[in-house]
Amino acid sequence: MSKIILLLFIALLAQPVAAATQGKIPVRAAYSSISGAGIVTWIAADRGLFAKNALDVELIYVAGSQAMQSLLSGTTPIGIQGIEPVFRVNAHGSDTVMIFGLVTKPTFSIMVRSEIKDYHELKGKPLGVSRYGSSTDLLLRMSLEKWGFKPEVDVPILQMGGVPPILAGMQSKKIFGGPLSLPTLARAKQEGYRELVDIADLIPDYQVAGVVTRRAFIKQSPEIVRGFVRAMAEAIAVFKNNPEAVRSVMKNRLKIDDPAVVEETQKTYPKYMPAVPYPSRPGIAVIKNSLDKTEPALRPLSIDDQIDNRFVREMEESGFLNEISRAK
C-alpha cells in the first residue's frame, strides 16, 4: 500500500495543466497542498473559472519551501501556500504578501499507529511532517508543546516530503504517526490508524493556506491578480455546492475514486473555508507567536505588512461574493 501511495503522489507531481485558451493572459501558478486547498485550485482550472477571468493558468505542484523559492524567482508569480514562508522571506527584505485566505482553520488530525493509545505514549517515538517549516511541522510542534513535550527532544520529528508520504511512513513503520489532512486522513482512518486528536480542538485558529504573491507583481499585473482571486472565490463556492465537481477533481487529478473518501472531503472542508476569504488575523497571530519563539528575526514584523485585503474587499463590497455563493 505504501508503494501505491507514493506512486499516486509522484503521478500528481507530474501533471501540470495548461488551459490553452486563445486571448487569455498566460500565468504559471503554484500549489503546495494535495488536500482541500489543492482541490479548490483544480476546480478553478477544470471548471474554466480562470479562463472566465481571462487567464490561461498553468498549475504546477511545488512542495513546501520550494513554492516560495519558485515565487521569488518569478517562475510561479502567484500561488497557494501558507503564511509561514511569507514571514520568513519578508524578514530578509522581500515583498511577499497573502491576499486571500483559502483555509483559515486547522485541517489536520494527528494520526498514529494502532499501538499508540494516548498522547503520553509518544515520548521517544518519531513522528513525520511534510517538510520542516511547513504547516504540518508547526502544528505538530504546537500540539506537542500543549501536551508538555519538547519537540525533537522528547519526540523526534522526521521530514517525509508531503502528506501522503506521512501515511506511507506509518505503513512502512518508519514513523509512528503525524498530521494528516483529507483526503489522506480518510484513507488512514479506513486502514485502521488511530486519530489521536483533531488539531482544531487544540488550536482553533490557524491560517493554513491562501493566495500569495509579491507586491511588485500586484503593481505590475493587477488584473492577473484580480482574475486569479475571483476564480478562486468562485471555486470555493463550487466546492461547497457541487459534490460532482469535487469527485471529478479527486478522481482525475488525485486518482482517488473511493466514494467514502470523496464524500468526507466534500462535507468536511467547507467549514474550514470562509465565506468572505480575508486572511485570518487570529490564525496568523497564532503562527507568528509560535515562530517568534524560535526565529527572532521575525519578531519586528507586523501582521498587517504580510497581508493585503484590497482584492477580497473589492469582491465583498461589489457584491461579487454574494453573486457566486450558489455557483455550481
Explain the meaning of each model-derived region.
Residues 3-15:
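Bacterial N-terminal signal peptides
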Residues 42, 87, 141, 186-189, ...:
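Predominant activation on well-ordered alpha-helical scaffold segments within soluble catalytic domains
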Residues 219-300:
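Secondary-structure end/capping motifs
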Residues 20-172, 176-182, 195-199, 204-205:
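Short, glycine-/small- and polar/acidic-enriched structural segments
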Residues 1, 16-22, 328:
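Basic/polar N-terminal segments that are highly enriched at the extreme N-terminus
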Residues 58, 65-66, 155-158, 263-270, ...:
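Short linear loop/turn motifs
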Residues 292-328:
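Conserved C-terminal helix/tail region of periplasmic/extracytoplasmic solute-binding proteins
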